């Protein structure tokens, strides 16, 4: 057996590669900064004071550990696997994003940075970044595509309330990819005082590994909680994937447990065959974007194709390089779910459990509705409920009205 098949949690290598994916594809001006960040992060990881402070904020500010909840009514409805929900939507700010933001802001402060920049799609990472910047009294600038600003107005207002400046990005389709491009441009011109707080397991090394490490608290807690409740490990894990940080947070602590089946769910939008989707692994090819090599949605000329998903947090045309590698070696199974399937799962979760999930998380739930009924009753399935659905009310209302009109 190769090293890569037995120690799956050891990546990346010193250059930031997970197999053929990852790396540091950045402008020369950024390279010293990236290397400095990697050094600082390695030092922080070994520093008991940093770990202690991180644990304090995770507990008393974020509200961790988040519950691992037995979804009795979902389980009854499916009539198969026993379904547990990892309740990340109960965190401060309503999603998993804060786990990473609290870690990175402590690092930024350690490095003496005074200005924080970030990109956001659904607005949840923007809100979480603005939140931690407010808590530590740092200047905060959020880049957000105009399309996303339109569909996530409540989150834009939240960011401004928290003291952040929200800069609209009109380039491209005005979504996450474009916001990330602008944030990288800002960083290049303000390297001295600025810390770029990336929101997912993408970007140049050390970001994919660093974000994963801060999110891995999800999977570590899940191991302990399920052991306490069921006396054993789960049989399967399910999580939605845009860039892939909530999924990597749940998956990573289980990668070396061969008995645990791992399923990542991409956004199929209108369907993979239509070309209007955000499924980089199921409908993309390898290429370089935002500082790393990964699977991307691109045309024959290598130009990035715009991603589509009803969920603003999933319509990124790439995926974290560690996911690309796990797909490549076959450790994780990557499936996809359409807008309609996600909406159906969204409604079922509301009615059956009294929990309004984010549309991102509803993609994972849709996969559960497909799989759980085919599995035995002693199969333990853990689903990452990555965020709450408050931000999606407008989208769901609009979709319901449109559907109603189409029927008449």
Curated annotation (Swiss-Prot):
GO terms for molecular function: tryptophan synthase activity. SUPFAM superfamilies: Tryptophan synthase beta subunit-like PLP-dependent enzymes (SSF53686). The modification N6-(pyridoxal phosphate)lysine is found at residue 97. Its cofactor is pyridoxal 5'-phosphate. Its EC number is 4.2.1.20. InterPro entries: Trp_synth_b_CS, Trp_synth_beta, Trp_synth_beta/beta-like, TrpB-like_PALP, TrpB-like_PALP_sf. Pathway: Amino-acid biosynthesis; L-tryptophan biosynthesis; L-tryptophan from chorismate: step 5/5. Keywords: Amino-acid biosynthesis, Aromatic amino acid biosynthesis, Lyase, Pyridoxal phosphate, Tryptophan biosynthesis. It catalyses: (1S,2R)-1-C-(indol-3-yl)glycerol 3-phosphate + L-serine = D-glyceraldehyde 3-phosphate + L-tryptophan + H2O. It is an enzyme of class 4 (lyase). Pfam families: PALP. The keyword Lyase applies. GO terms for cellular component: cytoplasm. HAMAP family: Trp_synth_beta. The beta subunit is responsible for the synthesis of L-tryptophan from indole and L-serine. Tetramer of two alpha and two beta chains. Belongs to the TrpB family. This is Tryptophan synthase beta chain. It comes from Pseudomonas syringae pv. syringae.
């Amino acid at each position: 057996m190769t090293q890569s098949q037995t120690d799956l949690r050891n990546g990346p290598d010193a250059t930031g590669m997970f197999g053929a994916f990852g790396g540091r594809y950045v402008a020369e001006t950024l390279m010293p900064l990236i290397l400095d960040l990697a050094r600082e992060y390695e030092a922080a990881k070994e520093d008991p004071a940093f770990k202690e402070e991180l644990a304090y904020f995770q507990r008393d500010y974020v509200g961790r550990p988040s519950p691992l909840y037995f979804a009795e009514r979902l389980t009854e409805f499916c009539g198969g696997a026993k379904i547990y929900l990892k309740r990340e939507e109960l965190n401060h700010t309503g999603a998993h994003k804060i786990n990473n933001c609290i870690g990175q802001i402590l690092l930024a402060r350690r490095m003496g940075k005074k200005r924080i920049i970030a990109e956001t799609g659904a607005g949840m990472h923007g809100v979480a970044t603005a939140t931690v910047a407010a808590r530590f009294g740092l200047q905060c600038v959020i880049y957000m595509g105009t399309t996303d600003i339109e569909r996530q107005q409540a989150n834009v207002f939240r960011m401004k309330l928290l003291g952040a400046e929200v800069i609209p990005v009109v380039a491209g389709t005005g979504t996450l990819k474009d916001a990330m491009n602008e944030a990288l441009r800002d960083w290049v011109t303000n390297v001295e005082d600025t810390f770029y707080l990336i929101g997912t397991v993408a970007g140049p090394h050390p970001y994919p590994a660093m974000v994963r490490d801060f999110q891995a608290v999800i999977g570590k807690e899940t191991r302990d909680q399920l052991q306490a409740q069921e006396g054993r490990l789960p049989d399967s894990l399910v999580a939605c994937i845009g860039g892939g940080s909530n999924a990597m947070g749940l998956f990573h602590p289980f990668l070396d447990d061969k008995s645990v089946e791992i399923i990542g769910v991409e956004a199929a939008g209108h369907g993979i065959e239509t070309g209007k989707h955000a499924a980089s692994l199921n409908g993309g090819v390898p290429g370089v974007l935002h500082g790393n090599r990964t699977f991307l949605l691109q045309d024959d000329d290598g130009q990035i194709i715009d991603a589509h998903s009803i969920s603003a947090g999933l319509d990124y045309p790439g995926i974290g390089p560690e996911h690309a590698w796990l797909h490549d070696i076959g450790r994780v199974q990557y499936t996809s779910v359409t807008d309609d399937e996600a909406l159906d799962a969204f409604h079922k979760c509301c009615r059956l459990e009294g929990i309004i999930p984010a549309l991102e998380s509803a993609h994972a739930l849709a996969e559960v509705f497909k799989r759980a009924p085919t599995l035995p009753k002693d199969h333990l399935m853990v689903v990452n409920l990555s965020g709450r659905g408050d931000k999606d009310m407008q989208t769901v209302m609009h979709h319901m009205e449109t559907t109603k009109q189409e029927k008449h």
